[in-house]
């Protein structure tokens, strides 16, 4: 068995995602969520959760910011609200959320998603043994390493299978500083059209700025059609699509294609090649599935 999850932009996406075979819909909140696709109020999340449950789907909320001491009380209050709403899952990055959720008897809803930190079985098992629902493996490890970890871990593991990967976060508002240095005014709010280019590379790396700072993403779009069956066979049951930089229609179609591959209706390799042709400007890639991030390029 496997489950597909993806973030939504608006409540109208829920029926669309249901029809595409997505099992869990992620919601983001202002202040609490890093790099959101769409942002929702608590009232909208409550409404969305009820609709999802009617459709036999699950709701998840991203509490993925790092909390300072003065912000922990707001985190506790939000956790209490989400518990009352009967939200199914809560993604977290800061372990303060784990402690607060423990005090509120809701650890079983948590999914630990620290981006790069879960790189071995001991890491994953430690957090799962705290009684949380699941752990997201680092997106910078290889497929072979993911399979090796899954063979040793008892509990729910999640892997990000598709989309642009976050590669850098700074609390500083770097884009604002850049445009101030240039003496130019520029609307940066919800602007997903900016990118960086290295002098010696052709890749476009998306860069965004929000209330949590500046975020830079990979110059490629991860595409794992040819890998997902091996991951599921190894015991990884939760597969997530990164919705950012995709429309909700694209997210839904991508989910359909993954489900077709996983259920044997389409070839993973053929689907990967089709996406390369369909999205020539997105640098469709297997990412780090076969390439260690520690690999050093040597000029010959």
Where are these regions (language model features)?
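As written
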Residues: 131-132
């Amino acid at each position: 068995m496997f489950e597909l999850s993806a973030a939504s932009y608006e409540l109208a996406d829920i029926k669309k995602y249901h029809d595409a075979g997505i099992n869990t819909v992620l919601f983001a909140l202002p202040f609490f969520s890093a790099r959101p696709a769409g942002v929702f109020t608590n009232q909208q999340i409550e409404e969305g959760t009820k609709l999802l449950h009617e459709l036999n789907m699950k709701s998840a909320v991203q509490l993925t910011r790092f909390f300072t001491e003065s912000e922990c009380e707001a985190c506790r209050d939000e956790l209490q609200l989400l518990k009352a709403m009967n939200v199914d899952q809560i993604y977290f990055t800061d372990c303060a959320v784990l402690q607060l959720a423990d005090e509120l008897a809701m650890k079983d809803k948590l999914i630990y998603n620290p981006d790069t930190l879960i790189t071995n079985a001991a890491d994953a098992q430690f957090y799962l043994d705290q009684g949380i629902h699941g752990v997201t493996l680092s997106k910078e490890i290889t497929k072979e390493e993911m399979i090796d970890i899954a063979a040793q871990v008892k509990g729910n593991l999640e892997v990000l299978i598709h989309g642009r990967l976050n590669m850098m976060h700074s609390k500083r508002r770097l884009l604002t500083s850049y445009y101030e240095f240039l003496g130019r005014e520029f609307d940066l709010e919800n602007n997903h059209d900016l990118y960086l280019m290295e002098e010696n590379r052709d890749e476009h790396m998306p860069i965004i700025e929000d209330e949590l700072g500046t975020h830079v993403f990979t110059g490629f779009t991860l595409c794992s059609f040819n890998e997902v069956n091996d991951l599921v066979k190894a015991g990884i049951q939760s597969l997530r699509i990164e919705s950012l930089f995709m429309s909700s229609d694209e997210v839904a179609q991508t989910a359909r294609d993954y489900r077709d591959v996983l259920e044997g209706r389409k070839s993973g390799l053929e689907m990967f090649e089709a996406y390369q042709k369909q999205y020539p400007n997105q640098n469709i890639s297997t990412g780090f599935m076969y390439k260690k991030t520690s690999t050093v390029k040597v000029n010959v």
